[in-house]
């Protein structure tokens, strides 16, 4: 934030001053700020409040516009609030402004971005617009001449606020759905672009979860396609726009009656729709970004990440099995092979899935870390409610699983414990199995056992019957007089939280 407030040149001078004054000494954050004050002649008293403020402040933005014969004006009112502390903070906010079509509106000196400083509880910034450009922020004398009562809320200008995460704050900015879409497509700042993209997808998926008759998956797949088409084919950052909200992202929105099965249905529906709508684009990207498995470099890592995500989507399509097979067998890179196993673990063609899983096991059964990954893949399938538990019980009977080996347990039983689709199934068999394992493991390794207990940390958000079953078994755990302290403390905390 200090860099953002001062700019590169003054900040570098501040760093030089800092070493001049304090090199070789035991220093504090305040000493660092003092060096910056020396070279900038700026008072950082309010900035120091960051070092003694708990919680994350919320910055609220309200935008309004009005027109007069002598000019157009746009006002943004920004206020700060922190429920845990009343300290006023110095908050630098990078902003840019776009019109209703997503075109950037230039400000003074032909810049597309400006830094405004919120150093009061509430502050207003008024811009004057001429010739489709926003001039400098009007000074206080002119503001007094502006009739503030004429400002009305309109969205012919869209503010992109806190660009580049210029300040660690929560932003309360009531943008409309359409304005968010414009920023997700056209904003040149990756941080805000991706954040609004995530918000849009999450809002639509959540709507689908809550309303069985609503299906936004096709519209969202087309929206993702529009966002991706704005990227050049060689821009590897577009992989972020192929990532959907996870079960954890969606479940956080519920405080009770968590619809586990419905959430997974919606996720799978969106994944399939994206694969269908973006099929040609995905294949184009996959063919373009060939990674070199023998060269370790950031670029090759990014390419593998992108191709891994593409393989995951293509596995949803029945007629793209050749690409999946080629991706697996034409590489010696384990990351690529595991990407295929991860992509196909939930498909309904069990024979196709088993073909690759058997091949991986037969080739790498002497490599314990790889077999741990293989176990985890078996225990995390969400093909149906029973498959994962059947896999786990079967593997536990084999010679390559050792319940006294923590890595084996974390991979197989820990993997199943994180398989929300299966453990929260209607039969409650997953719960029963895990509670049996907790008691058994507690006698062998209480640390591992307590980790599995944490699976039930949010059980109070589940539906009534699920909650009752889990609560009953957690209470039974506490009645066990031989229970380890580690498991007892975690269990007691979960029950009484």
Predicted regions mapped to residue ranges:
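Eukaryote-skewed repeat-based solenoidal scaffolds used as protein-protein interaction platforms
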Residues: 357, 375-376, 380
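Non-catalytic accessory/interaction domains
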Residues: 8-12, 16-355, 368-373, 386-388, ...
């Amino acid at each position: 934030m200090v860099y953002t407030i001062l700019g590169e040149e003054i900040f570098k001078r501040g760093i030089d001053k800092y070493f001049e004054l304090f090199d070789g000494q035991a220093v504090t954050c305040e000493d660092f700020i003092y060096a910056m004050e020396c070279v900038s002649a700026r008072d950082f008293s309010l900035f120091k409040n960051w070092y003694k403020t708990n919680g994350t402040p919320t910055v609220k933005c309200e935008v309004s516009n009005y027109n007069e014969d002598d000019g157009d004006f746009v006002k943004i009112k920004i206020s700060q609030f922190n429920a845990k502390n009343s300290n006023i903070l110095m908050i630098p906010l990078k902003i840019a402004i776009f019109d209703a079509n997503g075109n950037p509106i230039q400000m003074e000196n032909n810049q597309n971005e400006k830094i405004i400083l919120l150093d009061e509880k509430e502050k207003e910034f008024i811009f004057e617009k001429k010739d489709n450009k926003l001039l400098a922020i009007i000074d206080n004398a002119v503001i007094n001449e502006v009739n503030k009562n004429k400002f009305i809320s309109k969205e012919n200008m869209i503010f992109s606020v806190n660009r580049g995460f210029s300040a660690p704050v929560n932003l309360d900015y009531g943008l409309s759905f359409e304005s968010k879409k414009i920023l997700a497509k056209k904003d040149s700042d990756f941080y805000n672009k991706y954040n609004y993209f995530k918000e849009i997808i999450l809002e639509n998926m959540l709507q689908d979860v809550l309303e069985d008759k609503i299906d936004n998956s096709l519209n969202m797949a087309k929206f993702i396609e529009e966002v991706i088409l704005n990227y050049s084919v060689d821009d590897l950052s577009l992989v972020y726009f192929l990532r959907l909200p996870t079960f954890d992202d969606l479940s956080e929105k519920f405080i009770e009656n968590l619809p586990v099965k419905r959430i997974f249905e919606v996720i799978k529906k969106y994944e399939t729709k994206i694969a269908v709508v973006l099929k040609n684009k995905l294949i184009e990207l996959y063919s373009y970004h060939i990674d070199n498995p023998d060269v370790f470099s950031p670029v090759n890592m990014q390419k593998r990440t992108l191709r891994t995500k593409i393989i995951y989507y293509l596995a949803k399509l029945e007629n793209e099995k050749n690409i999946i097979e080629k991706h697996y067998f034409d590489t010696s890179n384990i990351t690529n092979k595991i990407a295929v196993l991860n992509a196909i673990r939930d498909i309904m063609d069990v024979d196709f899935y088993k073909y690759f899983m058997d091949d991986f096991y037969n080739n790498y059964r002497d490599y314990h870390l790889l077999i741990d990954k293989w176990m985890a893949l078996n225990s995390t399938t969400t093909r149906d409610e029973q498959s994962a538990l059947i896999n786990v019980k079967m593997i536990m009977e084999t010679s390559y699983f050792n319940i006294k080996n923590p890595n084996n347990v974390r991979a197989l039983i820990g993997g199943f414990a994180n398989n929300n689709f299966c453990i929260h199934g209607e039969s409650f068999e997953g719960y029963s199995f895990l509670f049996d394992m907790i008691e058994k493991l507690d006698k062998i390794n209480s640390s591992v056992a307590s980790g599995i207990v944490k699976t039930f940390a949010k059980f109070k958000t589940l539906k009534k019957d699920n909650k009752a079953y889990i609560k009953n078994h957690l209470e039974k755990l506490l009645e066990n007089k031989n229970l380890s302290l580690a498991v007892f403390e975690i269990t007691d905390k979960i029950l009484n939280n």
